[in-house]
Amino acid sequence: MKLIISSLSALLFSGVILSAQMPGMVTMQQASASQGTSLGANTTSGAAGIALGNRVVMRGFVDFQFKYDDEDSNLTPGSGSQTEAFNTKADIDFLFDFSPITGEVHIALGKDDIELEQAFARYSLNRDFNFSFGRQLTALGYESDEQPGLQSVSNAYWLADRLAGNAQIGTAPKGPTQTRRNYKDGVRANFNNGKFGVSFGLHDGYWKNDNFNGDNIAIDIAASLMIVPGLEARLGYAQEQYDDQSGSSDNISQLNGWIAYQPGDLTLAFEFDNMDILSDEYWSMMFHANYQFVNWMSATFRYSHEDYEAMSVSNEADRLSFALLFSLTENFGLNFEYSTTSVDRLNVGDYDEFYVEGLLTF
């Protein structure tokens, strides 16, 4: 409770002392209330970026981060570990508009590998209805999958992805379970008329697997309503049946809902998640607040709670984050974040993180 009060006080105090505009600073356009939902929409046509001819647009970002973390152990009081690291990654997207056919290719570049994030095409039957097929971003979840859309440096949730990889039935699944938004192959039917959007997808895996072997198949459906300009509510459900090599079968399912309000400079959001991960159970909630004090500076306060029950053992995490985001030019931002996570597990205690990020967008 003291931590929550002190964090709220810090947010208010920072807003007071930093709300005066810095002279000579290059400014950006302030946020305005969103007029429509993006779920199911054709967001390729008319997208901003660097024009490479009449029908191709390129956009992307370079993300450079310094991270310091301090992890305490619950096993031995006073013990733990501290690490510091630099990390650089980049992302390049190519958008093609041959209306009524549009398409996108997203490439992620890290220091060790190059990954195809998304590669899909879309056929628009009319202004409101379209089909998309290929490797696409999954629909469930409030947080952006890429740094420029986060309004922070880190993600809200700490516990789920670290434990979900241990969920197993019969033969242990290979690799971790990505419980947040990721990229999967499949087909989607989409509808969007501005005020209301819906998307229904069929995939060869949503969290695990990448084939239709056995009964491995996944579906997801999400619907979004722009109640009034700036106030959006979204609800989605996804399920994947998982069959391992031993013949055992179980499901992974997720119910996700969020509501966001953005009247102008203020953004408020609340998200709730409930998942059955094979034989494990997981639920989480997140509150997100961002305020644009001036054109070149905003602040974000975020709180999340997670409860992960594996083999009747409950693991909980409470995470508080505070970020200051500075737009030095239209294309370059300098961001700072402090996050502290209280973890109720046998071998992990408090976990503190500090980030400095330079973010170039184009």
Language-model features and meaning:
Residues 195, 224-311, 318:
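Detector for outer-membrane/organellar transmembrane beta-barrel domains
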Residues 75-80, 148-154, 317-319, 353-354:
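Flexible, surface-exposed loop regions and adjacent strand-edge segments
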Residues 44-69, 80-205, 215-217, 224-232, ...:
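Outer membrane beta-barrel
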Residues 52, 84, 107-116, 179-184, ...:
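Solvent-exposed loop/turn segments connecting transmembrane beta-strands
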Residues 5-8, 13-63, 362:
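N-terminal periplasmic/intermembrane-space "pro-region" immediately following the signal or transit peptide
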Residues 41-51, 96-100, 125-129, 193-195, ...:
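Outer-membrane beta-barrel proteins
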Residues 64-70, 89-91, 98-100, 107-111, ...:
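Transmembrane beta-strands of outer-membrane beta-barrel pores
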Residues 326, 332, 350-362:
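Outer-membrane beta-barrel "beta-signal"
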